[in-house]
From Swiss-Prot:
<keyword id="KW-0689">Ribosomal protein</keyword>
<dbReference type="Pfam" id="PF00411">
    <property type="entry name" value="Ribosomal_S11"/>
</dbReference>
<dbReference type="GO" id="GO:0006412">
    <property type="term" value="P:translation"/>
</dbReference>
<dbReference type="InterPro" id="IPR019981">
    <property type="entry name" value="Ribosomal_uS11_bac-type"/>
</dbReference>
<comment type="subunit">
    <text>Part of the 30S ribosomal subunit. Interacts with proteins S7 and S18. Binds to IF-3.</text>
</comment>
<dbReference type="InterPro" id="IPR036967">
    <property type="entry name" value="Ribosomal_uS11_sf"/>
</dbReference>
<dbReference type="GO" id="GO:0003735">
    <property type="term" value="F:structural constituent of ribosome"/>
</dbReference>
<comment type="similarity">
    <text>Belongs to the universal ribosomal protein uS11 family.</text>
</comment>
<dbReference type="GO" id="GO:0005840">
    <property type="term" value="C:ribosome"/>
</dbReference>
<dbReference type="InterPro" id="IPR018102">
    <property type="entry name" value="Ribosomal_uS11_CS"/>
</dbReference>
<dbReference type="InterPro" id="IPR001971">
    <property type="entry name" value="Ribosomal_uS11"/>
</dbReference>
<dbReference type="GO" id="GO:0019843">
    <property type="term" value="F:rRNA binding"/>
</dbReference>
<comment type="function">
    <text>Located on the platform of the 30S subunit, it bridges several disparate RNA helices of the 16S rRNA. Forms part of the Shine-Dalgarno cleft in the 70S ribosome.</text>
</comment>
<keyword id="KW-0699">rRNA-binding</keyword>
<keyword id="KW-0687">Ribonucleoprotein</keyword>
<protein>
    <recommendedName>
        <fullName>Small ribosomal subunit protein uS11</fullName>
    </recommendedName>
</protein>
<keyword id="KW-0694">RNA-binding</keyword>
């Protein structure tokens, strides 16, 4: 019986890019918070969201969940050498300010904060009013 000879495959370790300047995109909706850290061209370095960290249901929309997201994303991006960021905030959620503060507390220097929330020129009809 013939023996099966396996070829040895050499796997190279993925190169870590040393990126010093980047962008932080914080999307804070009524239901969740997503923090994405990118280089200046928009290529993702690291990201995190509330559901990924174990928050479920209505706890995903809290400022504390957004803070934990920002810390986790900053930690993964700082391994690539990220030091200075420009922050772009999108959405009406509760975790906007908490995420920015968490990025600063994690050791990233914030050089710019910009609100890029899309504002309709009377586009889609908004959801009906809640009656509680």
């Amino acid at each position: 019986m013939a023996k099966v000879v396996r070829k040895k495959t050499v796997r190279r370790k993925k190169d870590r890019k040393n990126i010093e300047r980047g962008q932080a995109h914080i999307q804070s909706t009524f239901n969740n918070s997503i923090v994405t850290l990118t280089d200046m061209q928009g290529n993702t370095i690291g990201w995190s969201c509330a559901g990924q960290l174990g928050f479920k249901g209505s706890r995903k929309s809290t400022p504390f969940a957004a803070q934990m997201c920002a810390e986790a994303a900053a930690k993964s991006a700082m391994e690539h050498g990220l030091k200075t960021i420009e922050v772009f905030v999108k959405g009406p959620g509760a975790g906007r300010e908490a995420a920015i503060r968490a990025l600063q507390a994690a050791g990233l220097e914030v050089s710019l904060i910009k609100d890029v929330t899309p504002i309709p020129h009377n586009g889609c009809r908004p959801p009906k009013r809640r009656r509680v």
